């Protein structure tokens, strides 16, 4: 199986669209008029910052994910590696290990105290006590503030990033098993107009979904509310000029355990892949 690593346009009509199915019946999600920034000057010509971001909050990080972060740094030596944490993530011994391996650890809640946007992000995070939900929001903000690439932490790193990872991108797949743009792996510049569109429309998306369950949030709706379904709606609405679409076989679904794309890791084509541990459930 052969496909380009980067495409400039994909067939949006083939993407799964849960917001056009049962959600509209309940809360008219597809009728939401999101507000967007002026994208006329967006041409994806700025090289991204050389940062890679991971998140682990809610419990002490385990050995598997600790080694994931360290291995990413060993492979991508020219990148700064950030692990975003809360007060539960690290022991003194683990912190020493990360520092000895040049991993930057930052408490996300120490970042959300300075301005109106940060307070807004903090308020959205606090609406639901589910770490998958919180991580969906955190990943958008940390890449907006620092720039670079976000990856879920249940990942395996195989080879260094190259020129394919210089410019803003999202990761997609369109095949017989699934067709979507997910949020487990993406890259944007600091202060990206696209990420600002994501962030500024979070509240409207979250509040819409909360209508389903008497102002509560149910776990099954998180991907539509803050995850891949949410960002896909915004990408389809705007079709940002020259945004890169990276096939997930090269960065998410190329692992040896996969059905369709296992050859990508076996043949050295994947840069990394994810193991889908469902660690936020």
Q: Positions of the model-derived regions?
A:
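Glycosyltransferase-associated regions of secretory-pathway enzymes
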Residues: 1-135, 151-281
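Small-residue hinge/turn detector
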Residues: 136-148
């Amino acid at each position: 199986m052969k496909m380009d690593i980067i495409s400039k346009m994909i067939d949006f009509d083939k993407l799964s669209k849960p917001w056009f199915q049962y959600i509209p019946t309940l809360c008219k999600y597809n009728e939401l008029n999101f507000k967007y920034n002026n994208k006329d000057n967006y041409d994806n010509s700025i090289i991204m910052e050389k940062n890679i971001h991971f998140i682990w909050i809610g419990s002490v990080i385990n050995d598997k994910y600790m080694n994931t972060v360290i291995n990413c740094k060993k492979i991508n030596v020219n990148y700064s590696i950030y692990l975003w944490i809360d007060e539960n993530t690290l022991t003194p011994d683990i912190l020493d290990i990360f520092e000895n391996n040049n991993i930057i650890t930052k408490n996300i809640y120490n970042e959300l105290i300075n301005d109106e946007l940060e307070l807004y992000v903090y308020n959205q995070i606090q609406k639901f006590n589910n770490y998958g939900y919180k991580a969906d929001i955190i990943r958008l903000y940390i890449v907006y503030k620092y720039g670079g690439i976000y990856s879920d932490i249940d990942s395996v790193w195989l080879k260094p990033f190259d020129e394919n990872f210089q410019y803003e991108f999202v990761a997609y797949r369109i095949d017989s098993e699934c067709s979507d743009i997910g949020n487990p792996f993406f890259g944007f510049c600091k202060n990206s107009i696209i990420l600002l569109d994501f962030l500024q429309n979070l509240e409207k998306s979250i509040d819409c979904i909360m209508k389903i369950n008497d102002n509560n949030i149910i776990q099954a709706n998180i991907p539509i509310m803050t995850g891949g379904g949410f960002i896909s709606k915004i990408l389809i609405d705007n079709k940002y000029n020259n945004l890169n679409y990276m096939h997930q076989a090269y960065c998410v679904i190329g692992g040896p355990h996969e059905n369709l794309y296992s050859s990508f890791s076996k043949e050295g084509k994947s840069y990394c892949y994810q193991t889908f541990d469902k660690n936020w459930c």
